[in-house]
Each structure stands twice: as C-alpha cells, then as structure tokens.
Amino acid sequence: MERKERLRAGIAAMGLDISETAQDRLLVYVDLLKKWNKTYNLTALRDEEKMIVHHLLDSLTLLPHIEGVQTMLDVGSGGGQPGIPAAVCRPDVQITLLDANTKKTAFLQQAVIELGLDNVRVVSGRVEAVSDVRADVVTSRAFAELADFVSWTVHLLKDGGYWAAMKGVYPQEEIGRLPQDVCVEKVQRLDVPGLDAERHIVILSKR
C-alpha cells in the first residue's frame, strides 16, 4: 500500500474528516522528519510506515478532543507531535509548540516555515519558566507524569480550559497521585490503526 493510501485508510478508519490538501501536508511533514532526523535526533523511528502510524495517526487521535478551542499549547513538543499534525488539520486553532531542546525547536521553526503554518508559534524554554502563553487546552504526548504535567503548566491554562494528556497504558497510579484540585473529566482509550499498543487520552480540569 502506498503511503498516501495508508494515511487515507487510517484517517477513514478513525472516522476523521481531513482534506486531501491537509493529508498531503502531513506527508510533507513526514518527509521533513526523515530529512532532518539525523541532524536533530527527532525520532527513533526510521521506517516511513511506522512514522505515519506513530507520528501522524497517533497525533490525530487528539482532534476530536480539541473541538471548539481557539488556542492550544503542546508541551514537550519534540519533533512536533501532536502539535504539528493538529495544526495542519485545524488551521483555525492557534497552536504554540514548546520544547526546552533548542535543536528540536530549530527543527520546529523550519517545519512551520516549510509547511506554511501561520497558526503556529514555536517557543524554546523550560515550561516552568514560560509565562507569556495562555491556552484553552494544554496537551502533551508522553511528556511527564500527570501530577508533574499539571503542576508545571497550570499557569499557562486559561480559565475554563483543560489538559489533554496523551498516554500509553491506562495511567491508574498517575491518576491516583493527582492533586485534590484537579478533576478527571474523562479517560478514553484511543484506537490507532496499525499500532499494536495501548493508547489513552486523559482530560483534566481545575476544580
């Protein structure tokens, strides 16, 4: 199966409505990851098929959970997941990509330019030290334990906003260690076509 067909089939299986133009840009993003990976150490994956599954389809599971938001912060964005795929598919959402690794933020800047993502801003720095970002939703993929993720980013969350943490196996123990003033709105299992591993998204809010 050609990569375009593989991506299209995965998106269809997930029940998402993503334009052909956006799908083409997602594949350009994979090309950029492959091109710059040796220089910036962006991903351990080398196989394009695995990149489509792990970096595109896995990131796109976030889309149903950011309906109606205007601003999003992707913390520990690394090579741009889930922020860049989300930005490609949701040009109406202003997205900030934050990472402390300057090599990775250099790549993110390059990717934003080459993909023409006018809705994306890249910030380099430690999340605790950032103060000029406020978002309706703060997300991360495999960034930190939930309690740390929440405490490090609470100052960046708008009133009425929420956290969307992308996790692997159901994080029962991490949920148990959350502070009292954080409410677990939802934990949903995610199905990623072609991925033989558990995925969950944890939606949290301030009480």
Curated annotation (Swiss-Prot):
The keyword Iron-sulfur does not apply. It is found in: Cytoplasm. GO terms for molecular function: rRNA (guanine-N7-)-methyltransferase activity. One of its GO terms (cellular component) is cytosol. Keywords: Cytoplasm, Methyltransferase, rRNA processing, S-adenosyl-L-methionine, Transferase. Pfam families: GidB (PF02527). Its EC number is 2.1.1.170. CDD domains: AdoMet_MTases. S-adenosyl-L-methionine binds at G76, Q81, V127, E128, R141. Belongs to the methyltransferase superfamily. RNA methyltransferase RsmG family. This is Ribosomal RNA small subunit methyltransferase G. It comes from Neisseria meningitidis serogroup B (strain ATCC BAA-335 / MC58).
